[in-house]
Structure formats: structure tokens, C-alpha cells
A protein has these predicted regions:
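Extended interfacial segments that mediate partner engagement and assembly in macromolecular machines
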Residues: 91-92, 96, 100-142
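N-terminal cysteine/histidine-rich coordination modules
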Residues: 1-103
Length: 142
């Protein structure tokens, strides 16, 4: 039985934490374009908590959005060659030999990450699981 004026749980709009940028990113290693996911930051998504002794910010969970992990959006990962870097490093690579080495190691990176994170996907919205996989990819890339 439905009550008029009361929305069912499935009818409610899903709360957005991120969006896909209109501008495509160009991978400096394989020269292919891919989508970039950017975290939305307003409306109480990130409630800054205390700093730890290591000066790391703890983010408090909000009632509306729950626990947020903003650090998973700092890494960019190309879904074509599995190159992952900080977004600030995801520009033109000056050393062409390094870019060729990164490209030749792409399958090795994918297999290494797949053994630890077997269900990671670089095409969907990021979860904590996918964010950890991207950090591991970045570790293997650098």
C-alpha cells in the first residue's frame, strides 16, 4: 500500500558525492582520452575533524552523506594503460624513455593490482576499494 505524498525509499534521489568532468583527460603515456571523476565538496559532504599527530585531517561522517573518503579522488588512473599518478603529475611527461617504460609495464601493473584488488574497475564511480587500488597502481607506476 502506498500513501499519497510519501516517497518510497527507491524513489528518493541518490545523493551525489562526485561527478564526471565534461573535459576528457589525456593520458601522457598511451595518449588516449579517459573520463575524470571529481568529488563535490559543498553542502556538508566533508566535515573536517581534528588533525592527527602526523597532521592528517580526519573527516567526520555526516548524517546525509555518511563517511566520505576525499583522498581517493587525488589519484588519476588511465583505464587503458593502467598508469596512475597524482593529478598534478598527470601532465606531459618530459622523459619519453620513462613514458615508454610505463607503457611497457602496464600489463604487469594490472596483474599485480588485480591479485590484491580483484574487483577494481576504473570506469565506475569510485569506492574506497577502487581508491585503494588506484593508490596501489600509482605506487607501481612511480
Amino acid at each position: 500500500m502506498t500513501i499519497q505524498g510519501v516517497k518510497k525509499e527507491s524513489d528518493k534521489k541518490k545523493i551525489a558525492l562526485s561527478y564526471w568532468s565534461k573535459d576528457k583527460c589525456l593520458c601522457p603515456v598511451c595518449n588516449k582520452e579517459f573520463d575524470r571523476e571529481i568529488m563535490l565538496s559543498g553542502q556538508g559532504r566533508m566535515i573536517a575533524g581534528k588533525l592527527t599527530d602526523e597532521l592528517h585531517r580526519i573527516f567526520e561522517p555526516s548524517k546525509r552523506y555518511g563517511r566520505i573518503y576525499p583522498l581517493i579522488y587525488d589519484i588519476g588512473a588511465c583505464p587503458n594503460c593502467f598508469t596512475a599518478m597524482l593529478w598534478s603529475d598527470f601532465k606531459d611527461i618530459k622523459n619519453k624513455d620513462a613514458a615508454e617504460k610505463m607503457y611497457s609495464d602496464s600489463e604487469k601493473r594490472r596483474k599485480a593490482v588485480n591479485t590484491v584488488f580483484p574487483y577494481f574497475d576504473l570506469h565506475r564511480r569510485r569506492s574506497l576499494f577502487d581508491g585503494c587500488a588506484m593508490y596501489y597502481l600509482a605506487l607501481l607506476t612511480y
